[in-house]
């Protein structure tokens, strides 16, 4: 098997912001490629942590519960992946907007997964950019 990992690449820190109703399928499809890259390279290329707005357990649409490592306000990193999924409209209030705006200064890149781009739009983080929602 060919080794494609960059030897000088810094470990990338991913924060995965979960909301109640998130898709376990979307979560697995986000984390598994990172885990596989680590395994195949024999290096820690990616690390990730699960986040919620309030530090409380998030429950997926299928009933799986995920205990976050910390709340969003205490997190920083390279990529923030926002994963609301079903019922995202219920998460689109000012608390979420302020939290996402604040987090945009602590993360290098933002990724809206599933319906996450809607929350970025509500927080005005897509203003001035072309985006698909």
Residue spans for each PLM region:
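Structural detector of well-ordered beta-strand residues that form the stable sheet scaffold
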Residues: 110-111, 132
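A short alpha->loop->secondary-structure connector
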Residues: 125-133
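Extended, subdomain-level signal for the structured scaffold at the beginning of enzyme domains
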Residues: 1-110, 118-124
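Catalytic, metal-anchored helix/loop core of enzyme active sites in primary metabolism
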Residues: 114
């Amino acid at each position: 098997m060919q080794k494609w990992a960059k030897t000088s690449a810094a470990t990338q820190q991913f924060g995965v912001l979960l909301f109640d109703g998130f898709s376990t399928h979307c979560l697995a499809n986000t984390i598994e490629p990172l885990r596989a890259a680590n395994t195949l390279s024999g290096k820690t290329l990616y690390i990730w942590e699960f986040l919620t707005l309030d530090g409380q357990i998030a429950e997926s649409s299928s009933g799986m519960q995920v205990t976050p490592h910390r709340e969003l306000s205490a997190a920083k990193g390279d990529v923030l992946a926002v994963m609301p999924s079903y019922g995202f409209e219920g998460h689109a209030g000012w608390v979420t907007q302020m939290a996402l705006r604040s987090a945009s200064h602590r993360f290098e890149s933002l990724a809206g997964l599933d319906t996450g781009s809607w929350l970025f739009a509500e927080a005005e983080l897509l203003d001035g950019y072309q985006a698909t929602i």
